[in-house]
Amino acid sequence: MISAMEQRVRHYWTLRSHDFGAVRKNELENEMGQKWLREIERLLPEKEHLRILDVGTGTGFFAVLLAQAGHQVEGIDLTPAMLEEARLLAAQRNLDIVFREMDAQALSYAEESFDVVLSRNLTWTLPEPEKAYREWFRVLKPGGWLLNFDADYAANVRSHSMQNCKVAPDSPYGHIGMTDALQQENDEITLTMDIGQLRPAWDMRVLRRI
């Protein structure tokens, strides 16, 4: 059973799922997708056909990129509406990707199941990110790699530096459909999180404990 905060987060991303899917589809179809693939492949173990877990897959951007590159990918997310967008994206490209509704903080996989666990823009949304980190390491095979692409997004909320920043509605990488109400909800959720502290210093302290 998910917590009240997780329900709030899931509701927020449900409201954004369709527009978010449009942004990620746009990225897959332009140079951004190839830039991301090159960056990820530079960090991957030197092995073909890796078994990869995309945690917080959202609309399946990383999962699709890596499946197209020949890897065996599974994507998980807490938000069913996001997963529907991901399945649609994969089906449009005839890709066989397993997408599951799952809590990133309580994985249902056995230990040492994956060569790589990767995530993008997820840890800052988690109520218990330290628990999530422990789970991700648990399902990694010996010598496996954890790739976490994230940022100190709470810094913008703390400083209000983004208050007057407007993104053009047709921007391919912008937050299409991001209303003032959704922005306020995003800010309020962010400030309640343990991870709403200075990063990556917070992450480094946690990772040293694991």
Residue ranges and their predicted role:
Residues 1-48, 61-62, 145-181:
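Conserved class I S-adenosyl-L-methionine
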Residues 51-55, 59-106:
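Class I SAM-dependent methyltransferase SAM/SAH-binding core
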Residues 105-116:
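A short acidic, Gly/Pro-enriched loop at the edge of an enzyme's catalytic core
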Residues 116-129:
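A short SAM/SAH-binding and catalytic strip from SAM-dependent methyltransferases
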Residues 130-145:
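A short glycine-rich, Lys/Arg-flanked "PGG" loop and its adjoining helix->strand segment in the class I
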Residues 177, 182-183, 194-210:
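Short alpha-helix
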